[in-house]
Amino acid sequence: GYVLKYLEERGRHVSKAEEGRLAMGLVGVKRTTGQHPGGLVVIPQDMEVEDFCPVQHPADDPDSGIITTHFEYHSMEANLLKLDELGHDDPTMLKMLEDMTGVNVREIPLDDPETMRIFKTAAPLGLGDDDPIIGKTGTIGIPEFGTGFTRQMLVDTQPEQFDTLVRLSGFSHGTDVWLGNAKDLILSGTASVKETIGCRDDIMLYLISKGMPDKRSFKIMESVRKGRGLPEGAEGEMHDAGVPDWYIGSCRKIKYLFPKAHAVAYVMMAFRIAWFKVHRPLEFYSAYFYRRSQKDAFDAGLMLKGRDFVRRKINEIKSKSDATAKEEDLVTTLEAVYEFYMRGFEFAPMDLYECDAAKFLVVDEKR
């Protein structure tokens, strides 16, 4: 398109081959600029950003109050530090729950048996395992474990320990770690959940336990977690150390592996939120619905119409082959509302003098 427009403006006629040659010269040339809202490049205090690279305004808007680096970060990562300050909902939700209940979230036991059970069954919520909407687990609305994909992962693995949840977080955040890899190994009985690779640290620690040198184990882990496969000679060394073929094959398939510390942080927050779902349910749903309403994913007109209406709406959206992203996002909230009704809770009528402007408040033991 650019080449044809260029030729047309200049009244030139060239062969198809020349058009192709000119187009080849444009491949990879930047057309516009973008920005990562959480990406911050740190410049030493006694220097200016121009000492390292030119700067520009995002989308070439000179009136924008934001400046961005002209070069992509990887071209200067050896010289400058970049921070990715990503937003996260879970700490906000935990703060809300702490304020509503007076429970110190840091004192919630991470081995609470009833909380652990909801990752296998909905029984601690007073529900059966046969509801087609809720499914066989009780993790609707729990970060990390509330999507259809991760709930099925829980059904496949039947976790009973916190460590298994950390591994599952690694499976879901990695690339080519679960589907076509660990899932097949577990369901076929080739390996247990504990034996499979969930996070990058698992590889290094396993190889060291097999007697391989620390530095070599680290190098193999780094190569696999970046999606580069096994380094030269590593396969033979792993065979000699007694590493099974399925493990080596699993390493070859992985494109990206999540760090264990990151997975632990996510699962700790998820488990604490799950504790409130089991032991302080109304406060949990209040905080969850508020969070969804802030993302424009809570339609009060739909939610207040009762359990049967919500069930029909969920099935209606799920049966669509062309459901929009907004509708799919709405299903996430509707599932939590349906579960809320199934647990015997209900929404109180609006009261101009009692209601908060934005937040959901607990009225009594059922509302």
Predicted features by range, described:
Residues 1-367:
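Noncatalytic, beta-rich nucleic-acid-contacting surfaces in large DNA/RNA-processing enzymes
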